[in-house]
Amino acid sequence: MVGRDRWAGRIRPPGGSSLPLLFFEMNEVRIPAGRATLDGNLTIVDGATAIVFFVHGSGSSRHSPRNQFVARTLNKAGLATLLFDLFTPEEESIDAHTAELRFNIMLLAQRLVHATNWAKQQEQTRNLRIGYFGSSTGGAAALVAAAEIPQDVGAVVSRGGRPDLAGEALPKVQAPTLLIVGGNDDIVIELNEQARDRMRCEVKLEIVPGATHLFEEAGALERVAQLASDWFVTHIGR
């Protein structure tokens, strides 16, 4: 594992002060992905049996405050997390001017597959069960990757995602999938309903009342984080 910086500390799990603090270690890592090298933040929680890969949406990165919030919730539930950039800095610069990469779902999915294969070779993560958490276009990429390597992926969660962009991969997904959409995100609700109806695996559509696409309303992101945590713990967690 290539690490540039490392932090360690303790976090309190759900349930209050009566439970022991969980030890965690976070490393900045570099992930080979074909000709590209991707930067990521890997957090390992003591005793974790599963890891969740975060697949950000268009115009975002591993520094997404929403994904970081959800990741901390998963860490408190005893899950390891990997937040990583889908593009190199050079690619981000190109995409900022052309927008030609952010909707290339196959490229995003392949980057996720590369990251998964990398994690399977690292001592800290090779024995952990795997889940994907995708946002916006990242939701589609997560489903395409899950369909490509079904033996490796145990659960998928999509937040405000565009699963419709996964196209022909949808009926091939085997991992239990949770689709989370804001109640006021009408168009995306319809797209998620259509995608759900094409899937053959265990799939659930969860609507967060009063929430818009980015879940910026009070309590909305907390609800997303708890739904995701429950789904991953049930399907790949302890």
Predicted regions and their residues:
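Serine-hydrolase catalytic machinery in alpha/beta-hydrolase-like enzymes
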Residues: 29-128, 216-219, 223
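A conserved short beta-strand
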Residues: 151-163
